[in-house]
Swiss-Prot record:
Its main location: cytoplasm. Its EC number is 2.5.1.19. Keywords: Amino-acid biosynthesis, Aromatic amino acid biosynthesis, Cytoplasm, Transferase. Belongs to the EPSP synthase family. The lineage of its organism: Bacteria, Bacillati, Actinomycetota, Actinomycetes, Mycobacteriales. Monomer. Phosphoenolpyruvate binds at K26, G99, R127, Q172, R347, R388, K413. PANTHER family: AROM/DEHYDROQUINATE SYNTHASE, PENTAFUNCTIONAL AROM POLYPEPTIDE. The active site is at E314. This is 3-phosphoshikimate 1-carboxyvinyltransferase.
Amino acid sequence: MSSIEPWPAPFAPTPVHATVTVPGSKSQTNRTLVLAALAAAQGQGSSTITGALRSRDTDLMIEALQTLGLRVDGTGSELTVSGRIRPGPEARVDCGLAGTVLRFVPPLAALSAAPITFDGDEQARARPIAPLLDALRGLGVPVDGAGLPFRVQGTGSVAGGTVAIDASASSQFVSGLLLSGASFTDGLTVQHTGSELPSAPHIAMTVQMLRQAGVDVDDSIPNRWLVRPGALRPRHWDVEPDLTNAVAFLAAAVVTGGTVTITGWPADSVQPAKNILDILQTLNSTVRHIDSCLQVQGPQTYRGFDVDLRDVGELTPSVAALAALASPGSVSRLAGIAHLRGHETDRLAALSTEINRLGGNCEQTSDGLVITATPLRPGSWRAYADHRMAMAGAIVGLRVAGVEVDDIGATSKTLPEFPQLWTEMVEGSSG
């Protein structure tokens, strides 16, 4: 799954002009899979999904649901979810490095009447999970362990009620609980008790999709969500293109002064990555909506910038690459992203290490990065088994000849086609 040989990042000596089609949203795909599984588990019937992303993260979610006894049929991006929660003996869920599997599936497993063990990649064992497990214990679910590996011992039902949780390390703690809340006997009220919540738009996505499944959710009070018990409606889900994956391609237009068009860009989306457009416009880029496409025309030059990425932390590696390639001497400040230290890798440490390895100037702050743009030199860019880090290295390689990404295969986590799409884009033939 990971490349053994370093990947020479394509260099673009002239502006990139290309049209790119990116596959479905990972965030939406894994939420639709869980919602479809819950509807089926309630005996409401099967659901279908069109446009599903097929990547390591989504395949791990499919395998997790199958481990729980549910059926996920279909090939490619067309899926059908049916069945009930009936795990076999010694059921074991492999979370890999997928935060959505790690945090969305345990509440679902709590509805089982059998023990289910969770484990994952070595790096996943450092990802925050204890607050979610403590929340499940607070709801009466027996859980052994404070991190991977751990075991959820369901009793066939969860009473529900009110739970307080510090989700300042990950909004997925809240989303994971909310997704299963309507299947709890008394529903669920989640109260966030910690400091400012990161990636709040991802919780808004969860709430919107729950409502689309017929669930009554009250989010009228800040940092509190009430999910009333009830049936989840089986339905057809149509997954949008993954706007977060599209960001790297849009960044290519900015750093080369070219034009990149993304097909199928939704007119109205709850995906937080849509906020990248505001950032790109501050960099003197021109953004156009043309029919169902989004087109970004990059500037001749752009200077450093200040941006709070608290709600869109997933964009940080791509935005950091943009900052490193700004006009020499200009300074960018990326804030609101302390929680990235608990992602696939410590992304703040990784970004500062890799930018500085190539001769850049990147310093960590308590909640972000300060990047002073300086001419970069060729060299190796480590991905740390992190898909976003690998993509950031590809962006840098567009303007710095001789950059090699040590593990471009890490992009298989959310976009297995990335190396091909990227190369085709640089050649101007992607579509």
